[in-house]
Each structure stands twice: as structure tokens, then as C-alpha cells.
Design a protein with these regions (language model features):
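N-terminal maturation segment of proteins
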Residues: 1-452
Length: 452
């Protein structure tokens, strides 16, 4: 992934890349030191979250340096570099990868096989860490930037699940489906018409959605980012264990565009009806728009433009999904159900994450709750639950952040009436970058008061 985020037009670009590769052994040594410190303190991950790790490491190692992903920038080099220099750089790359990178990854693989994985625990909750619930409380506060406790969040999640479930049921009635909620979900999961057969067709679909979204942005925003973005597939080595999609922001110097990465592995778990909501979240008006604007802010110090609070960033991404109807999306009931399914997914996170780490739910119990209430594929649900197990509290940030933004929008509409301008509201919300939710609330309330 490092190579995909760099430009390789000149010799010095390749040399800069090699200088980074030379630091891989140090990086892995530091990682091993941190993992061993965690082991000494009793912080070990559940075994289920380490499944597939050895295969992932092995895919990085290989035997021939030229067959590794690290060598990809040297396989086909640009004509702007003369042949003699190309040969020099290729030989240097083979040496660096063979003598430094591959041995470091083999060392990491041996550590995981012989020291780490054998000691992995068979429990899932934070309750079984040395500091127990105190640790989960810290994780929750850190990711949500609020002081809500686990049961408050759990109850908010239950309330949101009930609200969204009612809206989903209305869509089921609209399409005149004969059967209950579970039967409709099974229909969505098994009817081949809801899925693509060709990975390129899936990517083209996302690109089309993004083009349509681009055209609608001026109706909702006064300021738009200069940085472009594109759609790519998640690399093959990563895709089987990866999520449905993610966004990689452009580098601060603007030398590369931002990238919306879509998973083309196992197309039968990538339904068409979720594509609009997903693209709006990851690209525009979601992560690309927000993060690119933040990167381009000129009135802030650099550390502010590169700081990210999950509740703000992911709250904005989820809020962006709700803008789809105003942008001309979700026009058919199945796409609307897909948007509701994605909102339900984030609401379920409040229930499931707290259920696992505060109430001590089993992995299967968490999976069952998600299966019963969402249209996500079984593969996606299992991947998601394993993520919640291994990353306590992070998944809470999405819905909590979105709820705060929605509350601020409703407050502004109510108080400002005819003076409310959604473009000005969005511009002000985004103009100082990512921040804790309490600070965001204070800023937006001041903006509302100043416009009364």
C-alpha cells in the first residue's frame, strides 16, 4: 500500500521509496517490542482475530524479491528515467528487499507463530483484560470524545435499532414482499440479481455514482476541495480479510489523488443496493470531501490539518449517507433499504460493541444480533464482529458522531427558520477540520446564535 500512495516519475522518487523500505526492519523491531510489552502486561488479542495473519505475512515475504509487492515500482519504470539508472535502481531494490525487508518479515512471522499466537486468548471482552471495564471506558471516551458510559451508549443503540427497523419494514411493505423481515433479508442475500458478476462492472458502478454525486455538491457546499479522487479495487493480497471499502486520503503535498478503495473479492457479498450509500460515505460528500478540505485549510497549523478524531470524521461519513436523498439518490426502494441497512449497521455497532466488551457477549451472540437486524452479508458481519472484538470502542464513534451532527442540523433549522442555509452550515462545520464532539457542538451553537 505504501507504493500506491507515492508518485514514481523520477529517480529520486524511487530512492525515497527505498529509503523507507530500509526502515522496515526498525519498524518491525519496534512493533515486536510493543507486542512483547503488551504480553507482559497481560494484553493479548483473542485468537479469532489473528486467523489469517500468518498467510498475510507470508504474502509479503516470498522467495524472489522481484515477485514481492515491494518491488512493484521497479517492474515497469517510466521513460523519464534512462535505462542505466533504471538498472541501477532495480538492482538496489532487489538488494534492499532481499537483505532487509524479507528477513524482517520472516522474523515477524516467526514471532507470531512461536510466541504470540500460541498465547492468544479464547475470550473476547475487555472485561478479561487486567484493567477490565476501566480499559473499555477509556476506549469509549477516546473514540467518541464524549463522557457517555457503556450502558448509555447501549440504550441509544437499542433505540436507534428500533427506529430504523420500523423504516426498513415500511420499505418491505412498499415492495409488497410476501414474508417477514428475516425472509426479506434472505431474499436480498440470495437473489443473484442484486449482485455483480464482474469486478470491473462493480468498479464502474461506483465511478458512475461518484460522478453523479460530484455534480450535486454545489447545492450543498459553498467550498469544495481542489484535490481529485478516484476509485480503485482493494489489492488482492488484502481483499479476503478486508472490509467492503475504505478511503485513503491524498498526501499533504497533493502529489497524489485521494482513493476510494472498493472490495471486489467475493462479489456475492457486495450487493448493488448498498453501493450508493457506501460511495457517498467513502468519497463525496463523505471522507474525500471532508479530509481533502481539511488538508487544504490554510488558516491552521499543519498538525491541525492532519489530526483526526474518529467521531468527527466517521460521524461526517455517516451523516453524508443521509444527504443522498437530497442529491437524487435512493430513488428505488432497494437502494433506500440499502441506505437504511447501512444506518442500521452503525446503530448495531452501539449495541454489539458494548454488548461484547461491557456485557460479556459471545462472538456468536454478537453475530446473531447483526444477522437478525441487518441486510449485511454473513461474511461482512463476521468480519465486522471480529473488528469490534479487536478494536474496542472504535466502532461507537460513527453513530455517536452522526447523531451529534444531525442534532446540530435540526437545531439550526429550528432556530434559524428561513435564514437557515445548508451550504453555510456545512462550510462552517468543516472549516476548522476534525475536532472533539463537545468542541464541535460549542462552535456550531455559536454559529447558530450569530445568525439569529
Amino acid at each position: 500500500m505504501l507504493a500506491s500512495r507515492m508518485s514514481f516519475e523520477r529517480s529520486r522518487d524511487h530512492e525515497a521509496y527505498l529509503s523507507r523500505l530500509k526502515q522496515v526492519p526498525r519498524y518491525i523491531d519496534q512493533t515486536l517490542e510493543m507486542l512483547r510489552n503488551g504480553m507482559e502486561l497481560g494484553f493479548l488479542p483473542p485468537a479469532v482475530t489473528l486467523e489469517g495473519v500468518i498467510d498475510q505475512i507470508s504474502s509479503q515475504v516470498g522467495s524472489d524479491p522481484q515477485q514481492t509487492l515491494f518491488y512493484s515500482p521497479f517492474g515497469s519504470m517510466p521513460s523519464t528515467i534512462d535505462e542505466q539508472d533504471q538498472t541501477r535502481l532495480q538492482n538496489l531494490a532487489k538488494t534492499v528487499i532481499g537483505d532487509q525487508v524479507q528477513p524482517a518479515f520472516r522474523k515477524f512471522k516467526e514471532f507470531m507463530q512461536t510466541e504470540y499466537i500460541p498465547l492468544a486468548r479464547d475470550t473476547f471482552a475487555c472485561l478479561y483484560y487486567p484493567t477490565g471495564s476501566d480499559y473499555y471506558g477509556h476506549c469509549s471516551r477516546r473514540h467518541t470524545t464524549t463522557h457517555m458510559n457503556a450502558m448509555e451508549i447501549h440504550k441509544i443503540g437499542q433505540s436507534e435499532v428500533a427506529r430504523i427497523r420500523k423504516q426498513m419494514q415500511q420499505v418491505i411493505s412498499e415492495v409488497e414482499f410476501e414474508g417477514d423481515f428475516a425472509a426479506f433479508i434472505e431474499h436480498l442475500r440470495t437473489d443473484s440479481s442484486f449482485y455483480h458478476d464482474d469486478p470491473e462492472e462493480l468498479l464502474r458502478g461506483y465511478r458512475d455514482i461518484c460522478k453523479r454525486a460530484d455534480a450535486m455538491l454545489p447545492h450543498l457546499f459553498g467550498r469544495l476541495p481542489r484535490a481529485p479522487y478516484g476509485v480503485r479495487k482493494i489489492p488482492d493480497f488484502e481483499a479476503p480479510r478486508s472490509t467492503t471499502a475504505y478511503y485513503r486520503p491524498a498526501p499533504p503535498d497533493g502529489s497524489q489523488p485521494g482513493w476510494f478503495y472498493a472490495n471486489t473479492h467475493d462479489l456475492k457479498s457486495r450487493p448493488r443496493y448498498e453501493m450508493e450509500a457506501l460511495a457517498l460515505h467513502e468519497a463525496v460528500p463523505g471522507h474525500h470531501l471532508q479530509l481533502a478540505l481539511q488538508n487544504e485549510l490554510e488558516n491552521l497549523p499543519r498538525w491541525r490539518t492532519t489530526t483526526h478524531f474518529t467521531a468527527y470524521t466517521e460521524g461526517w461519513g455517516l451523516y453524508s449517507e443521509s444527504l443522498g436523498e437530497a442529491m437524487g439518490f435512493y430513488q428505488d426502494p432497494y437502494s433506500r433499504f440499502g441506505q437504511l441497512s447501512y444506518e442500521m449497521w452503525r446503530a448495531l455497532r452501539l449495541v454489539v460493541d458494548t454488548g461484547i466488551h461491557h456485557l460479556g457477549w459471545s462472538r456468536q451472540q454478537a453475530i446473531d444480533v447483526m444477522l437478525e437486524n441487518s441486510a449485511l452479508s454473513i461474511k461482512n458481519i463476521e468480519s465486522e464482529v471480529d473488528r469490534y472484538i479487536s478494536w474496542p470502542g472504535q466502532a461507537l464513534a460513527y453513530k455517536i458522531g452522526e447523531l451529534v451532527i444531525q442534532e446540530l442540523v435540526q437545531d439550526a433549522r429550528s432556530k434559524l427558520g428561513q435564514r437557515f442555509d445548508i451550504r453555510s452550515f456545512h462550510d462552517h462545520l468543516l472549516e476548522e477540520g476534525s475536532m472533539p464532539l463537545d468542541l464541535l457542538r460549542s462552535r456550531m451553537e455559536s454559529w447558530i446564535d450569530s445568525n439569529l
